[in-house]
Every structure is written in C-alpha cells, then in structure tokens.
Amino acid sequence: MARKFSAGIIALVLVFSLSVKAQQVKDLAPGVTRVTQGELDQFSPYNLLQEKPKTAAMAALPAVTAAFDPKSIRIEVTSRGTVFHIPLADSEELYGFGLQMGSFKQKGMRRRPIVNDNPLNDLGYTHAPTTFYLSTKGYGIFINTSRYTTFYCGTHQQIKGDVNTNTGAGASAQTVEDLYKNNNRSGEVIVDIPGAKGGDVFIFNGPTLKNALQRYNLFSGGGALPAMWGLGLQYRMKADSKQQDVYNMVSYFRDNHIPCDVFGLEPKWQTTAYSCSYVWNPEYFPAPDELIAKMKNQGIKLNLWEHAYVNPASPIFGALAGASGDYKVWNGLVPDFAGKTASPIFADYHKKTFVDKGVASFKMDECDNSNLSEGGAVWGFPDQTQFPSGIDGEQMHQQFGSLYFQAMYSNYKKSNKRSYFNIRSLNGFASSYPVSLYSDTYVHKEYIRMIPNSGFSGLLWSPEVRESASVTELCRRTQTAILSSQTVFNSWYLKSPPWLQYDRDKNNQGEMLRDSKDVESKVRTLLNFRMSFIPYLYSAFAKYNQEGVPPFRALVVDYPEDKNTYNVWDEYMIGDNVLAAPLADSAATRKVYLPKGNWYDYNNNKVYAGGQSYTISTGLTEIPIFIKEGAILPIAKPVEFVAPNTVFDITCYVYGKVADTVQLFEDDGTTFNFEKDAFNTTTLGWQNGKGRVTRKGTYKGKLYDIKNWVNL
C-alpha cells in the first residue's frame, strides 16, 4: 500500500512539474498579457477575431501597473477539461460576463455565460455570453474559449494541505436560507471548462478599471462608430404589414413631424420566414425597388428582419447544402459561418439582392439558442451538431451571432457604407461591431440594468419600446430608450404606434386613446431631445472608437474609488459629462446617487452636491439626466432625420463658471473614410465668459454650426 501511495505521489509531482513547465506567459499587446497551457481550441474568440488591435491607442494609455503576477494564475488540465485559478482579493468587486440581465455585481456568484433566448435568471444565461470580467482593482480577465464555461467568483475553497475542522454554516442554521448559505470566501476565481484540453487567458491591465476596459475594447479593434442616422429613431412595422401600409405610416410620421430615420420590416416581407427564403414576398411587397426609392426620398432608411436558418425555397439553399451543420432548424440549414465557404455565399447573395439596392441595415434574429431553463424549448440545433469546419454545436451556439454579423457586415465594409444593425446574440471581442442587442423579454428594470452592464463587455444594448400598461409607463420606457445606444419602437405586433394606443388588443382593433394626440405630443418631445442629443452622442461613440471608452457605462467605471457606486445598476454615464437616471415602469420618483462634484438637473438647472443620494421627480416629457459641473453640453435644434447634408445648429450650455473643453467628432457620418483621417475635431471652450470654437482636421464638409452659448 505504501509503495502504491508513493508511486501516486510521484506521478502527481511529475504531472504538476510538466504542467508548470507547459504554462507560458507572453505580452500580446500594450498592457495585455496572455497565459496559456496545453492544447488550445481552434474556434476561440481570439482566433475568430477579424479586426486588428489599435496598439498605438493602447500604448497611449497610462503606464501599466499589474494587479497581480500573471504566473500566479494556475491552469489545470484534467481528464474532465480545464480549470483556471485566478487570484481574487477581499477588497475587489467584479463586473461583466456579457449582457447580464438579472445581476450587476458578480463577486460571490456562480456565473454561466451561456447563450439563451430567454435569460430571465441570475445564473448567467444571456444573449451575449462574453467570458470577460473586470475588477475594481484595475484589471480585466478574458477566458479565450467558445465552450460553455462556469465561473465561481470567490465562492469555493479548494482543499490545500490539512483539512480544518470548521463546522460550517449548517451547524447553527435557524432558517432554510441560513442552512444553504455559503459563508466560505476564497481568494480566487475558479473557471471550469469541461472538454477543453488546454487553457488560454488574457489579462487586460489598468491601472484603473476604466483603463482595463479601454484596452479590451481597443484590442477588439476599437469601439463601434455607427452611421450617424442610426442614432435616430428606428420604427418597426407590424409583422403582416404590406407595402401600402409602410407608405401610410411614413406619411403619418412626416405629416406629424415625428422624428424617424429607420423603418424596419418584420417577417412577412419574405415568402417564408421560419426558416427564411430571403426572397421578397410579392403579395405583401410587389415593388421593393420602388419601396426603397420612396423611403429614401422621405429620408427613411430600410431595415430588414431575418435569421440565418436557410429554407429550401431560398436561392442559396443548394449552394449551402454542403457547408452547413448536420441538423436543421425549422427545416432550414444552419450555415457553417466558421468555415470559408458558407459566409461568402450568404454574404454575396445579400449584397447583390439587398445591400446594392439600398437596404441600409438588418435585424438579425434567433441567433442565440432555445431557452435552457425549459425542457420544451427545443427549436435550436443540438450541442452535438457537427459542422464541416470542425466546430461543434456547443461552440457554434456561443459564436453564431458574431459570425453571422461578420458575414453580413462585410458587405457594407466592401461598399464603404457604415450601418447600424440589430442582433440577438454576440460573443467576445465584439466592441467594434455597430450593432445593438435586443431581447424578447420586457422587464423595464432589467432593460435599464442591461445598459450599464453592456458597457462592461464592449456591447451595445437597445431597451426597445413595445406595448405598455399606461401612458406613464410608455413615457418612462421612451425616456429609457432615448438614453440608450439605439432608440427603437418595435411595433411588430401593433397595428398603430403605441403612443396612439398602448394596449395591444385595443391597438389592433383600431381603438385609439381618447387623448392620443396629447400622448403623441409627449413622445414627440422626447424623440426631439434624442435628435438634439445626437452631436454629443455621436462624439461619445467616436471616443469609443478611438480610445475605447464606452459611450454608456456604469458609474463604477468612472468612480471606482467610490464604493457607493459599486452597486448602482440603474444609473449610468453617457459620454464624459452626462449621468442618466431613468425611472422604471410608472414611477413618479426615484432615488439617485450622485458621485463627487456638483451636478446640474438638466430640466431645472438645480445644483446637487455629489457624494450623496437624493429623491427626485421627473415629468413625463422631461429628461432624467444630470450634467457634471464644468461641462459644456452641445444641444442641437432637432431635425426629423439625419440627411447627408444635415448641419446641426447647436447651442452650447456651460455648466459652471469654469468649463473643460469638449470635442465634437465631425465626418461624413456614413462612410469609413474617417479611418483614413477624413474627419475634424471641433473643440468647444469657455474662457473669460466667452465661448470659443476651433476646428482641426482634413474633412471638407460641415456637421455643426455653433449658434449660441448659455452659461448656467
């Protein structure tokens, strides 16, 4: 027995020695360290990344101060898979893991960021399963895998050496909750990846949380810069609308001066939708070229709904038959976007049929997976699906949205046209993608929470408006929508806009609200603010692109030294100077925490001292935002849509006697020419009671005309 025991110990020592020798540490980019061990997966997020890191911008960030020694990360490769042990201090808090819906702070939690179409829980299921988290200690961790992964965020202790005699929580438990409470704190994050034959982790160093997040976004290719028209309103028609219905609705918007830039068509525009044919339905849209032309004349861009499961009636079905998975979805093929054959076939057809004819963007649906919490939800392809490229169903599920988007957006890059898509799933390193995530869920508080949560992972989120229970709720949801990355009214099951009738059944029966014109006026006022806000918002996106600072982000990103911000999930920064605090559902008041410094209520210019909480009330047509003292806020005269020749007439509001300079990004708003330095930086300054404007750059056009200055 002793001989066998000794042999076992020797074997373990040898395995451990080999493991240590096999682990490699390498600096990958400025402030980014990679730690690897064993056999790495072919279809990892890093291997699938198409954009080049912006290393010059990464190098310009503050000097790196490592939060811990990369060699202290322990990677174990076993017969089950791979396990990471990553240091975690008691004093730090964690955030991220993609588009989390049911949670904000992640320390002390078990997280499984797995793609799911109805992620109504706090386990980690999500539309965007990003295996990336950030720490208030000033670093980010990205686990480079497309496999289903579980993170134990300081929840479990591994036995090392002698086992102590702690009796545990159950010994004195008085309630069921106490009985099952885990009081064990561990100094590590444990990451479990079944099936993986090796480990690959990227450390994004700070020195601050914000700097670490910037490095992640810049490593991903820089943040997204959508076409400027994408920041206006997108209105989606009822699913069974016909061509004349679209004309009538466009006329309604223009006749009533309701701002709108994009109209979206839902499933019935195709001959078959589940699965998709990608062929215009002649019964509903007999003249699609005429439709596109007429909408263009009205300043409206066209967005088409689809998903990537290819019906036998599709012209590309035959070509994709040998380049798809071995299971169908809704009797349609699942293209192997991870290979080299399917993407060009899929993309080329869309370019010739839609993009070249003027379709401006797409809504890419159903690219997540069936609801994992329900046994009867089985529409998605199974995890054991095999694809010609070698990727399996599990990894394809995690990457399907990102790969699908890459194929579709390549058409616009080839055509030198920027766009702004809608999508239901993305994975890691997606920061550069001009696309907002959406969900079929509809809990308003969760919609608000996902705005700051999205910023932790290089994602954009659209809290779309559908039906409501009251006028108040409709206005509150609209306020949230105009203070997000993409403002969408999704009326796919509503015959008329929800401001004419918020009740679904009454809306579709043609029974409008008695005060519908008054509600319409309220919504118009809110949408006009969105249009006035575009110059500021567009410039925030430009900073995202160039410096990696998310345009929408949690307060803790900017104020990590303030522990009061650690659990503020229902407020967020927009750009550098605006703090948004939306009201959920039909609330008349809410509590707001303001960080250090003085803050101005945008609606009445009342000044609040930071470092405190306040109870505020916001009217239905007011904007629930606070402006940082020392800011210059450019507010434009609202336009009904963004045209190629639009010039925004701007009034600059100066908050305080002394103000920092503010930069507006100026280019054509529609092409990638800015990547060749065809842009201007318009700097707004305030000195000695007077405003100053300086413009530098090579762009010959003009987006902004500074008309007035107001000192508050």
Name each model feature, range by range.
Residues 1-9:
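Bacterial N-terminal signal peptides that target proteins for export
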Residues 8-17:
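Bacterial N-terminal signal peptides
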Residues 18-22:
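Sec/Tat signal peptide C-region and signal peptidase I cleavage site
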Residues 24-622, 627:
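Catalytic-domain carbohydrate-binding cleft regions of carbohydrate-active enzymes
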Residues 627-712:
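Accessory, solvent-exposed terminal regions and/or long lumenal/extracellular loops of proteins
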